[in-house]
Amino acid sequence: MGNYHVTLQASYIAKNVEDVEDAIGVAISQIGKLLNKGSLDYVDIDVGLTICPKCGEPIDCVLVVAKTAIVGILLSMKVFNAESPEHAVRIAKSSIGRALKDIPLEDVDVVEI
């Protein structure tokens, strides 16, 4: 049995936003509320990064069009006593997925701790 740090990626749609910063604030706030409601206050929330195709620098993973944004969010948590890295991902997806019912989740990284 091992302990793992699992990072998942989620996409969140934020409506009626003015700009990128507003979209990020709304997404983090709403996901935080959902996680806290599910007693998952131990899950870390961060904005995902993507690489700018022009300059190669990392930028926030946000697209705003017509006051609607899609925001890439990273959710990370520690999973204890998992049988394997794959088992740790399943545990994390199950725990977080219960709170974020209609938000798709994808595993990004699993590190043994």
Swiss-Prot record:
- Cite the Pfam families for this sequence: DUF555
Fetch the InterPro entries from UniProt: UPF0212
Family stated for the protein in its record: Belongs to the UPF0212 family.
Indicate what this protein is called per its UniProt record: UPF0212 protein MMP1509
Organism of provenance: Methanococcus maripaludis (strain DSM 14266 / JCM 13030 / NBRC 101832 / S2 / LL)
**Organism classification, top ranks?**
Archaea, Methanobacteriati, Methanobacteriota, Methanomada group, Methanococci
